A protein has these predicted regions:
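Short beta-strand-centered aromatic/proline hotspots
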Residues: 38-42
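Compact nucleic-acid interaction/catalytic patches
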Residues: 29-35, 46-86
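Residues at the C-termini of beta-strands that transition into short coil/loop
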Residues: 10, 57, 101
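C-terminal terminal-subdomain/extension
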Residues: 67-159
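Residue-level detector of flexible, active-site-proximal loop/helix-junction positions
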Residues: 13, 60, 104
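A broad, low-specificity signal marking well-ordered, structured residues that form hydrophobic/aromatic
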Residues: 5-7, 51, 92-98
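Secondary-structure boundary elements
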Residues: 1, 43-48
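An N-terminal domain-cap segment
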Residues: 1, 8-34
Length: 159
């Protein structure tokens, strides 16, 4: 699976892993269902068949305020990061990330039928912070909303 590329999650993922803390799969705009959110994927450190997906939100200002409040309270915020996607400011919601395997993914393709890719510096920042947040979560802190370790175990068992 290529690095720095964006993906959508399949409907089947939400059927197989019912967790109300997962970001919902489709938004309806003007009566039309759209695949949302899109995700940045990076491989798991232990199992290369499993990827971690970080949802991307266009609600930049909303998440800037939330991140700023966390910085004021804790001195830093690595559960929400910021970058650009297709020339627009975006929030990367590490706090909402989830594990997945390739069959549940669909590449985000642009109008030229090319995969949408991100700047390597943005990807490096998101991946570094996501791995730190995973390490914190493994020590028992509730810093990720979905039950990612339950989903991870189910994915491992299915491989």
């Amino acid at each position: 699976m290529p690095d720095a590329q964006l993906y959508f999650l399949s409907d089947q993922y939400y059927i197989d892993f019912q967790d109300d803390k997962l970001m919902k799969n489709k938004d309806t705009i003007d009566g039309i269902a759209h695949s949302r959110p899109c995700f940045l994927a990076f491989p798991d450190a232990k199992n290369p068949a499993i990827y971690w997906l970080v949802p991307i939100s266009s609600r930049y200002e909303k998440y800037q305020k939330i991140a700023q409040a966390k910085i004021e309270k804790y001195g830093r915020c690595n559960t929400i990061r910021f970058g650009t996607v297709l020339g627009r400011n975006a929030a990367f919601l590490i706090q909402n990330m989830c594990p997945v395997t390739a069959p549940y993914l669909t590449a985000y393709i642009n109008k030229k039928a090319e995969p949408v890719r991100l700047d390597d510096r943005v990807v490096a920042d998101i991946t570094k912070n996501a791995r730190e947040v995973l390490a914190i979560a493994r020590r028992g802190a509730k810093v990720i909303f979905p039950d990612v370790f339950k989903i991870y175990q189910a994915l491992e068992a299915s491989l």
